Amino acid sequence: MDISGHPKTRTRTIFDEVDEPVWFCCVLPIWVGEEMASGWGITGNKGRCYDFWMDFSECMSHCREPKDCTLLREDYLECLHHSKEFQRRNRIYKEEQRKLRAASRKGEEAGDGTHNHH
């Protein structure tokens, strides 16, 4: 398969004996500390969780113990991952399914005993 015209391939590499093209990839830098949440979102505006991060970060820089910032940490993580929201939706879905199964079982039981013979 010849893909030498592909914009991400090089025709000559230091490994010229290898038949496969070399693919470039983008590596996103990972910063530690303040740079980790710079405030810039993917659209160029402020990120959706930046305010939560700033509140949590400020609390951590002024608190005596990390447990003092537990609620702010939970808010920040919920903004990032939506885990509590997904758990709630899952509980609602399971309850709806349970009610549907119970209604169908009740309908089957009622249908078994009522045969009309004319």
UniProtKB/Swiss-Prot annotation:
One Pfam family, short name: Ndufs5
Disulfide bonds: C49-C79, C59-C69
InterPro entries membership: NADH_UbQ_OxRdtase_FeS-su5
The keyword Membrane is annotated on this UniProt entry: yes
Major localisation: mitochondrion
CDD domains associated with the record: NDUFS5-like
Highest rank taxon of the organism: Eukaryota
Motif (Cx9C motif 2): 69-79
PROSITE patterns: CHCH
One GO cellular component, as annotated: mitochondrion
Record-level GO BP terms: photorespiration
Protein family (similarity comment): Belongs to the complex I NDUFS5 subunit family.
Domain topic, free-text comment: Contains two C-X9-C motifs that are predicted to form a helix-coil-helix structure, permitting the formation of intramolecular disulfide bonds.
Xref: PANTHER family: NADH DEHYDROGENASE [UBIQUINONE] IRON-SULFUR PROTEIN 5, NADH DEHYDROGENASE [UBIQUINONE] IRON-SULFUR PROTEIN 5-A-RELATED
Name of the protein in question: NADH dehydrogenase [ubiquinone] iron-sulfur protein 5-A
Origin species: Arabidopsis thaliana
Upper classification of the organism: Eukaryota, Viridiplantae, Streptophyta, Embryophyta, Tracheophyta
